[in-house]
Design a protein with these regions (language model features):
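Rossmann-fold NAD(P)-binding glycine/threonine-rich loop
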Residues: 92-102, 111-122
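Short hydrophobic alpha-helical runs that function as membrane-insertion/retention elements
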Residues: 106-108
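N-terminal glycine-/serine-/threonine-rich beta1-alpha1-beta2 phosphate-ribose binding loop
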Residues: 2-104
Length: 122
């Protein structure tokens, strides 16, 4: 049985994105546009379940509006993987702690957060 035929046997991996700036926009674009390629590499479908933003009124190109939310906590609790690309120390730290404590895997490149609170988080 090929890897792709096995994909339908498993539920999608739910991905939450925290932040919709330059990096977040590109991550979302890749998750949405490269769905098949990513599924073949990962062995499961990656489903972008939402993008947490601070302000829904800010104009954002490339995001389906139904994915945007200001309720980061609910989004985090619905995800298997949380990708934090908001930057800064807060609320990023609290969101990562919530994700880790709820059993989600976390991806971040937030150097300031890792330098300041890395030992507490991981």
């Amino acid at each position: 049985m090929s890897k792709e035929s096995n994909l339908s046997e498993y539920r999608p991996i739910r991905v939450a994105l925290l932040g919709a700036g330059s990096v977040g926009s590109e991550v979302a674009r890749l998750l949405l546009e490269q769905k098949s390629e990513l599924a073949a590499r990962v062995g499961a479908e990656l489903e972008l379940v939402g993008v947490a933003v601070r302000d829904l009124k800010t104009k954002r190109n490339g995001f389906p509006k139904e994915l945007l939310t200001t309720d980061a906590e609910s989004l985090i609790l619905s995800a298997d993987i949380v990708i934090e690309v908001m930057g800064g120390l807060q609320p990023a730290k609290d969101y990562i702690l919530l994700a880790l404590n709820s059993g989600s895997d976390v991806i971040t490149a937030n150097k300031a957060l890792l330098a300041t609170h890395g030992s507490e988080l991981f």
